[in-house]
Amino acid sequence: MEQKGSMLLKVVSIIMMVGGIIGAVASFIGAVLAGIASAAMAQPEVSDAVNSALAAEGYSNSTGPVMAVIWIAVVIAVAGSVVEIIAGVKGKKNWDNPAAAQTLMIFGIVCAVLSLISNILFATGGMGVQIVSILSGLVIPVLYIVGTVQLKNQA
């Protein structure tokens, strides 16, 4: 008996749901830490000390822009986690429905793009390049997209 649907899509969808939940928790922690940093930077003595340290390294008055980039990255990471959870749920539900393949493919592409943007912003904001995050943020959505192509080819 020939199997209908994409087992790859089903498995990767479950991984995406779990990853999305972990990402949401990590994003929440990131938001808390960014909030603490923002509150600390609101204190003139802290802000002056940080600006002095950055100026000594050649970065003058850059704490505001750095914090803005970090906050934007946190918002995008939260959005990415939500999209990843939704994509996982929809993929798990529709792993054997070729009519849903196009919509699922769009979810996979959006997940990959949001992950890439978030990683670029974190690196730009001084958080460093997170190779594991970049790879997992791209490999899983690419596998999800491959699963949607398998599903679409069954139509």
Predicted regions located by residue number:
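Membrane-interface interhelical connector segments
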Residues: 39-63
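Membrane-embedded alpha-helical segments of small multi-pass membrane proteins
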Residues: 4-40, 63-154
